[in-house]
């Protein structure tokens, strides 16, 4: 099995980062690498079906996985079982799990574009309910794990990074006792193939302009499809 994860130095902290596609996982990884010392991300170089991949579908309802490239048959009875299996594959113990979350409405619009581009199962002209079911299940499992192991798992909202980056980094630093890099706070404006993060894009999230792009019909369906307990647990709101 190919591994691209470098062997960590003794002082490094091993991290696994997760999030659905289009939640800002690449941005978050780069942000943390630029602002904290001695982090080793252990997600690199693994197949999508393995629990060390950043988009791994952890949930038990495997038939709900919307794309065959992410199919897997791994089920875990507890966070400890998952952590041990992921650590076995990564080749070392891991006790920092960072989960990137995005508002389901802005995420859905972005993921829909991403799905068309990457030829995921997609229905034109109607709400792609299977994406929202994937969202519910993906983050429900991680929310449960965060309550089971609050000292090891943190759910990090993409919008909080945009709204108050310093406070968000401070929360991560305090939770995991990380060491901040010297110098001014760094915020990458562009990562890999993503578009540059401009003031207009910042306003798009801060002012929730994405809601204007969702039809009344689709909002009505999303209202009934999104898991209200999950959305509340992530500190978002269902639009009614």
Stretches found by the model and what they are:
Residues 41-44, 177-189:
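Short, surface-exposed acidic
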Residues 84-85, 162-167, 198-202:
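Short acidic alpha-helix initiation/capping motifs at coil-to-helix transition points
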Residues 37-40, 93, 116-119, 160-162, ...:
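Glycine-centered secondary-structure boundary/capping sites
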Residues 15, 153-154, 206:
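Short, functionally important structural connectors and interaction interfaces within domains
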Residues 53-58, 185-240:
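PAPS-dependent sulfotransferase catalytic core
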């Amino acid at each position: 099995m190919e591994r691209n994860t470098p062997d960590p130095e003794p002082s490094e902290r091993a991290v696994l980062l997760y999030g659905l596609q289009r939640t800002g996982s690449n941005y978050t990884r780069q942000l943390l690498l630029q602002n904290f010392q001695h982090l080793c991300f252990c997600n690199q170089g693994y197949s999508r079906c393995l629990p060390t991949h950043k988009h791994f579908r952890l949930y038990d309802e495997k038939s709900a996985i919307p794309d065959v490239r992410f199919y897997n048959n791994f089920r875990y009875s507890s966070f400890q079982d998952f952590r041990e299996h992921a650590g076995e594959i990564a080749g070392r113990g891991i006790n920092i799990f960072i989960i990137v979350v995005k508002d389901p409405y802005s995420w859905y619009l972005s993921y829909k574009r991403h799905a068309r581009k990457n030829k995921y199962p997609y229905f034109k002209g109607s709400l792609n309910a299977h994406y929202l079911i994937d969202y519910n299940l993906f983050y429900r499992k991680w929310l449960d794990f965060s309550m089971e192991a609050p000292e090891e798992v943190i759910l990090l909202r993409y919008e909080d990074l945009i709204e108050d980056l310093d406070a968000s980094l401070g929360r991560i630093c305090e939770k995991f006792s990380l060491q901040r890099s010297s110098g001014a706070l760094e915020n990458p404006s562009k990562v890999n193939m993503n578009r540059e993060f401009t003031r207009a894009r910042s306003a798009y999230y801060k002012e929730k302009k994405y809601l204007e792009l969702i039809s009344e019909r689709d909002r009505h369906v999303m209202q009934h499809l999104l898991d209200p307990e999950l959305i509340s647990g992530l500190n978002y709101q269902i639009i009614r």
